[in-house]
Every structure is written in structure tokens, then in C-alpha cells.
Swiss-Prot record:
Its biological purpose: Forms part of the ribosomal stalk, playing a central role in the interaction of the ribosome with GTP-bound translation factors.
InterPro entries, A to Z: Ribosomal_uL10, Ribosomal_uL10-like_sf, Ribosomal_uL10_bac, Ribosomal_uL10_bac_type, Ribosomal_uL10_CS_bac
Signal peptide: none
Pfam families: Ribosomal_L10 (PF00466)
Lineage: Bacteria, Pseudomonadati, Rhodothermota, Rhodothermia, Rhodothermales
Name of the protein this chain belongs to: Large ribosomal subunit protein uL10
Chain's gene name: rplJ
Species this chain originates from: Salinibacter ruber (strain DSM 13855 / M31)
A GO CC annotation given for this chain: large ribosomal subunit
């Protein structure tokens, strides 16, 4: 069933908003997936908090034309294309990597990952991107490192005090025994 101009304009607008809103965009070739596999993949993306949609290349290119700075993605809208939109660079890569390992299909293929202005279109990029830490993990590490010196200081101050307390207790015990 063909879509009318108004429906197509709405789709172009929706894709354009997402392309503009999300700093992380993955384009994949989903060719060769069964309906069940495709639905499974969509569910995995949804669980990870990643928006995933199949789109017509023509409509996606028209949406790209309206957005500044992401026109380099246009060449990757060829053949069957699905777009994953995310705030976290590692989540889509982890979903794809897990799916590829479990299904052993070699599909979907990563066409390109757009990570805040940088493009990764190397087949090995998926492994590298999947290993990236999330923003929350990085914040946790920074906080841990900032707190470590204070914890070491407290431990250092408590150590001699505890030794002195133990020594005084031993002396007191000896006096009681005498």
C-alpha cells in the first residue's frame, strides 16, 4: 500500500527529529532476517532503551537534507536500512553484538555508527563500540577516583589511632592482672 504525500511528510519529519535529537545513530543492513528474528532484535533494542526503526532510504535522505551536519550519513542509505537511535554509544553495539553471537547469522550488518559527529564504518568498529563504557559507568569511575584519596586519608588517620588504642588497652589489661 502506497503512502500519500501527507503520510510521507510526517515520516520525514519524524525521522528528521530523531536524527537531530539523538547524538548516537547506527545504520544497519537487516537483509536476510526472518520476521521472527527481526521482531526479536526490535525487542532487544527496546529493552536496552534504543529506538530502532526500518525506514525507506528515500525518506531518510530527505530527512537528512533538512538537518545540518549529518549529511555524511546519506551514502549509507542504500539497500535495506534500519536506524538505531540512542543516547549511549555502547548500547546499540552491545545489542547487535549479542544478537549476532546468539543467532550466528552474520546479520544484521553494521553499515555505520555516528557517535556525536564521528563515523565508524569499519566492520571491526562494532566490537570496539560495544566495549565502550556508558556515561553512568564513567561517572561512577570518576566519583570513585575522586573519593579514593579521602578514603585513604581516613584509613590512614584511623590506623595509628587504633594501634594506640590497642596498645593502651594492652597496658591497662596488664595493670589489672598485676
Amino acid at each position: 500500500m502506497s503512502k500519500n504525500r501527507a503520510e510521507k511528510a510526517e515520516i520525514i519529519e519524524e525521522i528528521g527529529e530523531k536524527l537531530n535529537e539523538y547524538p548516537i545513530i547506527y545504520l544497519t543492513n537487516f537483509e536476510g532476517l526472518t520476521v521472527a528474528q527481526s521482531n526479536d532484535l526490535r525487542g532487544r533494542f527496546r529493552e536496552a532503551g534504543v529506538e530502532y526503526q526500518v525506514t525507506k532510504n528515500t525518506l531518510a535522505r530527505l530527512a537528512l537534507d533538512r538537518i545540518e551536519g549529518k549529511d555524511a550519513l546519506e551514502e549509507f542509505f542504500a539497500g535495506p536500512t534500519a536506524i538505531a537511535f540512542s543516547e549511549d554509544p555502547a548500547k546499540p553495539a552491545r545489542v547487535l553484538q549479542d544478537f549476532l553471537e546468539e543467532e550466528e547469522l552474520g546479520r544484521p550488518e553494521l553499515k555505520v555508527a555516528w557517535i556525536e559527529g564521528d563515523m565508524y564504518d569499519d566492520p571491526e568498529a562494532l566490537d570496539t563500540l560495544a566495549e565502550l563504557k556508558s556515561r553512568e559507568e564513567l561517572i561512577g569511575e570518576v566519583i570513585g577516583r575522586l573519593l579514593a584519596p579521602a578514603q585513604n586519608l581516613v584509613g590512614g588517620l584511623q590506623g595509628p589511632g587504633q594501634r594506640l588504642s590497642g596498645l593502651l588497652q594492652s597496658l591497662a589489661d596488664e595493670e589489672e592482672d598485676e
